[in-house]
Amino acid sequence: MHLFACLCIVLSFLEGVGCLCPSQCTCDYHGRNDGSGSRLVLCNDMDMNELPTNLPVDTVKLRIEKTVIRRISAEAFYYLVELQYLWVTYNSVASIDPSSFYNLKQLHELRLDGNSLAAFPWASLLDMPLLRTLDLHNNKITSVPNEALRYLKNLAYLDLSSNRLTTLPPDFLESWTHLVSTPSGVLDLSPSRIILGLQDNPWFCDCHISKMIELSKVVDPAIVLLDPLMTCSEPERLTGILFQRAELEHCLKPSVMTSATKIMSALGSNVLLRCDATGFPTPQITWTRSDSSPVNYTVIQESPEEGVRWSIMSLTGISSKDAGDYKCKAKNLAGMSEAVVTVTVLGITTTPIPPDTSERTGDHPEWDVQPGSGRSTSVSSASSYLWSSSFSPTSSFSASTLSPPSTASFSLSPFSSSTVSSTTTLSTSISASTTMANKRSFQLHQGGKRNLKVAKNGSKLPPASTSKKEELALLDQTMLTETNAAIENLRVVSETKESVTLTWNMINTTHNSAVTVLYSKYGGKDLLLLNADSSKNQVTIDGLEPGGQYMACVCPKGVPPQKDQCITFSTERVEGDDSQWSLLLVVTSTACVVILPLICFLLYKVCKLQCKSEPFWEDDLAKETYIQFETLFPRSQSVGELWTRSHRDDSEKLLLCSRSSVESQVTFKSEGSRPEYYC
C-alpha cells in the first residue's frame, strides 16, 4: 500500500512537470471532442535571449517570435518528440548548430524567416524525415551548396526569397525525385508538387540558372513559383530584365543522337555503341542501363571542338546479360537529354576464319556495330598512333576491328612532326565476308559519316559491290598483330617524279612476317594501304604526283603506326615547271622595261605643262586688266593732234608711267615730232 502511494505521487509529479510552462511563454491546450488534443506554446518576450529549456514535452506547435535570441544550440528541442510545427521567426538568429533539430522525427513544418542566417545546416534535414515545409525567407543566405541537393527531395515547400542568392546549383530543380520516373513497385514519399519561393534575390543570369529561367517561362504543374516575375541583377546587359524576357548567350541544352536505336548481334561478338551530343557549354556524356545503374564497359569520350562531344562504349564478347536498353545521357549547365539504344543478342555462336596475307575468302559472323558514348578515357601522346590528315586541327580518326572474343583498335591522329591532336572515332556498322585486297583506301567524309572504300590493282570498286560486311572484313584483316616485330630507321633511298623507294630496319621478326605501308598525300583525305614483304626491308610506292609532298608510315602487319615509323617526303618536280617559271620571269621583266620609260615620259610632260601654265594665265590677266584710251583728255580732236589714233601704242605706254615722270623728261623737237617717254 505504501509503494502504491509513492508511485502515485511520482506520476503526479511527472505529469505536473510535463505541464510546466516557462514564465516568458504562454501554453495553451486545445482539446477535441474525441478526448485528444494538442499543446501550443508561444514565446514572444522581447527580453528573451536564450531558448527556453523547460517546455512541455507534449508540445505540438512551438512559436518563438520577436525575441533577441541569436543562436539555436545543439539538441535544443530533442525532448519535444511530439513537436510538429516549429516557428522561430523574426528574431536575431545568426547561427544554427548542425544538431539543433536532433530527434524531431515528427516535425512537419520549420519556419526560420526574418532572421540573420548567412547559412543553413542542410544536413540537419536528415533528422527531420517528415519535414515538408522549410521557410528561410528574409535572411542573409548567399548560396546553396551542391551537397544540399540530396536533402531536399522530401520538401514540398521551400522559400528562399529575399536573401542574397546570386546563383543556384545547376541540378537544383532535379533535387526532387518526381522529376524522374519512379520504378513500379517502389514507394515514393516525395511530394507530387513543389512550391518554390526564389524572388527578391540579386540573380546573376547565366547558364547556371538557365533551368530556372526556362521554368519561369512555362507553366509546370509539378513546380510552382511563388512569384514568377523575377528579374536579373547581373550581367549589366540583363539588369532589370524579367526572367521571361531574358535571352542567355552561349547557353544551349544538349541534343543527343545515336547512329542506331536497335542492334542485333551474335552471342560472343563485340559491339560498339556510339552517341553524339551537341550543346553549349560542351556537354558531358554518360552511359547507364535502363534502370539507371552504371555500366561496366570500356568507354571512350572526346570533344573534337567546342560544343560537340562523342562517345563510344565497347561491349566485348557479349552474352545474354548484356542484352537490353542502354541510355546515353548528355548533360550541361543548360539541361540534360538522353537517347536509348536497344541491344539484342542472338543465340547463334560462330567462329570467324582468321585472315592471312594472301587473297582469300573468309566468313565472319554477323556483327552490328554502333558507335556510342560514355565516360572519358584519356590517352597519352606517347602511346598515341599518328597519321597525317587535313580534317581539322582538333579532329582525327580511329578505326576499330571487331573479331571475337576481343576487340582490337588503333587511332590515326593528324600530326605535324610530333604534334598530337584529339581523337575522333571512325564508326562502322558492318557484317559478313569479303575478298582481301592488296591495296585499300579509307575515305573519311565530313559530317560524322564515314565510309570505307576498297581499291584493288589501282582501281576502285563501285560502291554497290562493296557491302558493309565486306568493309568490316577488310578492316578486321588490317588488325592482325605481330606484337614482337618493330620497325626502325625508316628512310627514303631514291626518289623519282612518280615514285619513291623506302627502306627500313626490322627487328624481332619472323621469316614470313609482313609489313603494312600506309601513305597519303600530305594533308589529303585518302589513306592508301599496301602490304610488303619484311624480308626485303624496302618498298617502292608508285603512282605519285610529280612535285607532291606525301606522308608514309611502315609498321608490322596489323600493328598501328607509331610516330617514329612515319616519314614525310616529296617527289621530284617536272622540268617543264622550271621552264614555265623562267618564261614567266622573262615576260615580266620585258613588260617592266617597256612600261617604265613610258610612265617616266608621261610624268615629265605633266610636270612641264604644270610649270608653263602659270605665266600663260598672267599674260591673259594683264590683257583684261588695262583699258585702251584714244586720248587722255576730253578735248576736241583738232587740239590733240599729238594724241592721234596713229599713236595709240604711245598712249598706252604713257599710262604705265607716272605723270610727274612724263612731265619732267619729255621734250619736243618739233611740233610734229614723236615724243619719247621714260619710265
From Swiss-Prot:
Residue spans, topological domain Lumenal: 20-582
Basic and acidic residues bias (residue ranges): 357-367
- Signal peptide span per the entry? 1-19
> What does the UniProt record tell us about how this protein is modified after translation?
Glycosylated.
- The answer to keyword DNA-binding applying to this record is no
The record's PROSITE patterns line, in alphabetical order, gives: FN3 (PS50853), IG_LIKE (PS50835), LRR (PS51450)
- Tissue expr: Detected in the outer plexiform layer (OPL) of the retina where it localizes to ON-bipolar cells (at protein level).
Q: What membrane topology term does the record carry?
A: Single-pass type I membrane protein
Q: Cross-referenced InterPro entries, in alphabetical order?
A: FN3_dom, FN3_sf, Ig-like_dom, Ig-like_dom_sf, Ig-like_fold, Ig_sub, Ig_sub2, Leu-rich_rpt
Q: Where is this region: Disordered?
A: 351-375
Q: Which residues form the Ig-like domain?
A: 254-344
Please state where this protein is localized.
Answer: Cell projection, Dendrite; Perikaryon; Endoplasmic reticulum membrane
Q: Which residues form the LRRCT domain?
A: 201-253
Q: Which CDD domains match?
A: FN3
Give the highest taxon in the source lineage.
Eukaryota
Instruction: Give the chief site where it resides.
Output: other
What Pfam families does the annotation carry?
Ig_3, LRR_8
In this entry, the parts of the chain located on the Cytoplasmic side of the membrane are 604-679
Q: Which PANTHER family match?
A: LEUCINE-RICH REPEAT, IMMUNOGLOBULIN-LIKE DOMAIN AND TRANSMEMBRANE DOMAIN-CONTAINING PROTEIN 3, SYNAPTIC ADHESION-LIKE MOLECULE SALM
Protein task: Plays a role in the synapse formation and synaptic transmission between cone photoreceptor cells and retinal bipolar cells. Required for normal transmission of a light-evoked stimulus from the cone photoreceptor cells to the ON-bipolar cells and ON-ganglion cells in the inner retina. Required in retinal ON-bipolar cells for normal localization of the cation channel TRPM1 at dendrite tips. Seems to play a specific role in synaptic contacts made by ON-bipolar cells with cone photoreceptor pedicles. May also have a role in cone synapse formation.
Name this protein carries in UniProt: Leucine-rich repeat, immunoglobulin-like domain and transmembrane domain-containing protein 3
Ranked from the top, the taxonomy reads:
Eukaryota, Metazoa, Chordata, Craniata, Vertebrata
